[in-house]
Amino acid sequence: MSSPRHVFYISDRTGLTAENIGEALLNQFGNLSFKRHTHPFVDTPEKARAVVEKVNRSRQENGQRPIAFVSVVDDEIRRIIKGADAFQINFFETFLGLLEKELNTEATASEQGHHSIGNTKRYDARMEAVNFSLNHDDGVSDKNLQEADVILMGVSRSGKTPTCLYLALQYGIRAANYPLIPDDLESADLPRMVKPYRDKLFGLTIQPERLQAIRQERRPNSTYAKIDTCRSEVADAQSMFRRHGIPFANTTDKSVEELAVHILQACKLKRRF
């Protein structure tokens, strides 16, 4: 079996753009393996040269030309990175020229956009949403719950918390979540805490076998992790969702990104920034 191809994500900011687009492309080659290296905040010539050295060293040690996904605005830094011995996909160079042609004007590179009032507002909206989600995780508090954009419900370990945090971070959505415990599942009514907010509820379900595997890692050989317990809880939760007309999604084969988009569409929610 051949050694994994080395992949570098190089950015003058967080690296999330390079990672997201790069991963979407690499996922089309499921038969190959990759070793990933992320280098964020490459925003000076010195940092760029250091990254180039790492890329070239990887080429020498691995014997294969690395792949580099580059998201860098500054021309000088991009020029330095171009000197790396790698197959490079530079998002700004690839798409900026096409946009300039379509808009019939040249781009004016500026760092100002990174620190504009608009970005400050986006940051504030994101942090407010994250704090809200953390303060309303796992049903710990019903204070200001009426301010939630959506309230996720599901049995323990069905993916509620990561989905809430992703909605908050990526979309500024105030997402709370409530764990369905056995007492809730035995009742024909909705849990008292979330009952007033019926229109904001969205359910998460999961295949019992997958749920058992997750719970087994947390509490090995416990009643909590038994397959019969998982099957019963999942079935009861789905019955509750159907009985009260609560939309729900299966988290088993969905990424958190897919789940978030599905929830936004189903609940008719819009990004806050």
From Swiss-Prot:
User: What does the UniProt keyword field contain?
Assistant: Kinase, Nucleotide-binding, Serine/threonine-protein kinase, Transferase
Is S-adenosyl-L-methionine one of the keywords UniProt gives this record? no
**Which reaction is catalysed here?**
[pyruvate, water dikinase] + ADP = [pyruvate, water dikinase]-phosphate + AMP + H(+); [pyruvate, water dikinase]-phosphate + phosphate + H(+) = [pyruvate, water dikinase] + diphosphate
Task: Output one GO MF annotation.
Answer: phosphotransferase activity, phosphate group as acceptor
Pfam families to which the protein is assigned, alphabetical: Kinase-PPPase (PF03618)
InterPro entries reported for this sequence: Kinase-pyrophosphorylase (IPR005177), PSRP (IPR026530)
Entry EC no(s): 2.7.11.33, 2.7.4.28
Where is ADP annotated to bind? G154, V155, S156, R157, S158, G159, K160, T161
What NCBIfam families does the entry give?
Answer: PRK05339.1
Q: Which family does it belong to?
A: Belongs to the pyruvate, phosphate/water dikinase regulatory protein family. PSRP subfamily.
Q: What does this protein do?
A: Bifunctional serine/threonine kinase and phosphorylase involved in the regulation of the phosphoenolpyruvate synthase (PEPS) by catalyzing its phosphorylation/dephosphorylation.
Protein name (record): Putative phosphoenolpyruvate synthase regulatory protein
Q: Which organism is it from?
A: Neisseria meningitidis serogroup C / serotype 2a (strain ATCC 700532 / DSM 15464 / FAM18)
